[in-house]
């Protein structure tokens, strides 16, 4: 499982021009599910995202997490994170989990993250074409990955 995590001052997702989720200060998490992922990887990634110390403390040092700041998270599914561009010019998505499994693990990730944060987490919609807007803060962007064989 991979989470592309971006510290944002605001982020929002729309489907067909209608807003479906938005946050202010927090993390935008683009989530990709690998074909070998299980609930173990999902739970690990959710906890890691909740505990990532990427927000500045009183001294300006990146040392606080969403749990410390009370910030929000917005989670958007993105199977293209598993796009393989090593051969040719058209990405292959064979490493991405099939949609039914990916959707279940995506929902599991969201529930786990909500449990850690103690609040509802707005999300994009699995399988939908979405417009995502964000204002990076920093910018701070991290690649958080956990493979089933680790």
Swiss-Prot record:
UniProt cross-references to SUPFAM superfamilies, sorted A to Z: DTD-like
InterPro entries: Daa-tRNA_deacyls_DTD, DTD-like_sf
Key words, A-Z: Cytoplasm, Hydrolase, RNA-binding, tRNA-binding
EC number(s) from the headed UniProt entry: 3.1.1.96
Keyword Nucleotide-binding: no
Top enzyme class: hydrolase
Example of a GO cellular component annotation carried by this entry: cytoplasm
Subcellular localization: Cytoplasm
Reactions listed under catalytic activity: glycyl-tRNA(Ala) + H2O = tRNA(Ala) + glycine + H(+); a D-aminoacyl-tRNA + H2O = a tRNA + a D-alpha-amino acid + H(+)
Superkingdom: Bacteria
Chief place of localization: cytoplasm
Motif (Gly-cisPro motif, important for rejection of L-amino acids): 138-139
Subunit and interaction comment: Homodimer.
Role: An aminoacyl-tRNA editing enzyme that deacylates mischarged D-aminoacyl-tRNAs. Also deacylates mischarged glycyl-tRNA(Ala), protecting cells against glycine mischarging by AlaRS. Acts via tRNA-based rather than protein-based catalysis; rejects L-amino acids rather than detecting D-amino acids in the active site. By recycling D-aminoacyl-tRNA to D-amino acids and free tRNA molecules, this enzyme counteracts the toxicity associated with the formation of D-aminoacyl-tRNA entities in vivo and helps enforce protein L-homochirality.
Domain comment, as recorded: A Gly-cisPro motif from one monomer fits into the active site of the other monomer to allow specific chiral rejection of L-amino acids.
Protein name: D-aminoacyl-tRNA deacylase
UniProt source species: Salinibacter ruber (strain DSM 13855 / M31)
